[in-house]
Amino acid sequence: MRQDMPKPSEAARCCSGLARRALTIIFALLILGLMTWAYAAGVPLASDRYGLLAFGLYGAFLSAHLVAQSLFAYLEHRRVAAAARRSLAKGPLDAATARSVALTISAYQEDPAYLRQCLTSARALLYPHTRLRVLMVVDGNRAEDLYMVDMFREVFADEDPATYVWDGNYHQPWEPAEATGAVGEGAYREVEAEDPGRLAVEALVRTRRCVCVAQRWGGKREVMYTAFKALGDSVDYVQVCDSDTRLDPMALLELVRVLDEDPRVGAVGGDVRILNPLDSWVSFLSSLRYWVAFNVERACQSYFHCVSCISGPLGLYRNNLLQQFLEAWYNQKFLGTHCTFGDDRHLTNRMLSMGYATKYTSRSRCYSETPSSFLRWLSQQTRWSKSYFREWLYNALWWHRHHAWMTYEAVVSGLFPFFVAATVLRLFYAGRPWALLWVLLCVQGVALAKAAFAAWLRGCVRMVLLSLYAPLYMCGLLPAKFLALVTMNQSGWGTSGRKKLAANYVPVLPLALWALLLLGGLARSVAQEARADWSGPSRAAEAYHLAAGAGAYVAYWVVMLTIYWVGVRRLCRRRSGGYRVQV
């Protein structure tokens, strides 16, 4: 007769946890030390006679990282494909046993065209009708916000939708209304014990299939909190979605399959693609970058069950777990300031902190709007970088509960911007022109190799244009990251609603300072090289390499820009005129 294994005692579990923490800290410090030493020492692994074409230990480390990341992403795609074949063999989902799901949509001053696409796609989701609820919460209850409520009522007209305009929200002060008829000093008065608006919202959400609530403005986190709190424990899973997102009909079903297959998975995200890639060169490059971010970087994380961020446009959470950390998630503070951005990343971190896995599936897909102007894109990236640095610190507390890859990748990605900035400044101020050009060639070469792998994985030649994103990172995103680092405790939506686009010029300041630093260093280096003696054999070889390298760099840009203008701008119809909003 088999005997049950004894459960470990509380002391044993505590010791095991402390040991894992200690080993994780040692591993993180080891990675940090090796990277810093490899960068600072500049150990060359291969070099030509004059040291002009050199390949160092740090470059080898980054190359190995990219190869490993690509390999694990490929293996994860194969794993997802195998799971899809198993699901297909099981047949369609049984409506009687399907998990109940609530689709929550966060809306704020949305472009009516995008909002209509979002709501229409929500209607078209291929999921058992009786097991799916739709809840949209509008951040704002003024007259100019109610067009979103009207559109919800119009799109779901045949579903008997319920709409409610709430004067407050869950966290706005509420004054009980006195009962009428009680007059005179000391007279008996009856007051309402609870907010009638909250009670009405919760009653509608838990009894009606399609509900839209417009509440007092409070920010996106307030909107999401209302949806989660009002739902309570009435559903099994909660899907998050933004109002500018168009869902693929199979998006929800594929997410549900991931959670159904493994109870250890607490949340799963899908493939977010760009809805407006042809609006501008910024949105086009963003569309390529998005694909790699999800199908290479997050696919790699998913292989180790530790996706760092379930993206807001398309994610699914186990509701019983979400309700456990809902209050802590909403009340998050950083340096004494209440956090109002980085909602999706902190939701993911809360799930990881409980020891549950987070996954990504490329079979679930949606299309979301991205900024088409450089200024708005810069504001968006600054906001995302703020939440990244802040959540990096929180995420570090739970590295020991997950695979070592989570620790390794967090350290590498966290240090990377600082090493890039240090390299650029050192070359501009202390390096020779050829050294600067050699680094630029290496950067574009690595970017082209990564783009070529993405083109092969996706089966789309146009992905090679992703290599053009490298200069955008170096010149725009890198200084924005440092602005984000020093302004992490400043809260807000970060980007404006799409109905009324507002320019934010604050992120331009670090770009201007960065440009002045680089121009100053370049002028200094050019002046020094102009006075140098170029008659020696090493200098002659450097001049030859400089001419050949400059020719290769210019040729690369000519080819890539030609592909972009001919293959993208001229052969694809571009949406012009920005947003045409009619309410």
Curated annotation (Swiss-Prot):
Disulfide bonds: none annotated. The chain crosses the membrane at residues 25-45, 52-72, 405-425, 436-456, 463-483, 502-522, 546-566. Residues 46-51, 426-435, 484-501, 567-583 are extracellular. GO terms for biological process: estrous cycle; extracellular matrix assembly; hyaluronan biosynthetic process; polysaccharide biosynthetic process. Changing W384Y: Loss of both activities. Catalyzes the addition of GlcNAc or GlcUA monosaccharides to the nascent hyaluronan polymer. Therefore, it is essential to hyaluronan synthesis a major component of most extracellular matrices that has a structural role in tissues architectures and regulates cell adhesion, migration and differentiation. This is one of the isozymes catalyzing that reaction. Also able to catalyze the synthesis of chito-oligosaccharide depending on the substrate. This is Hyaluronan synthase 1.
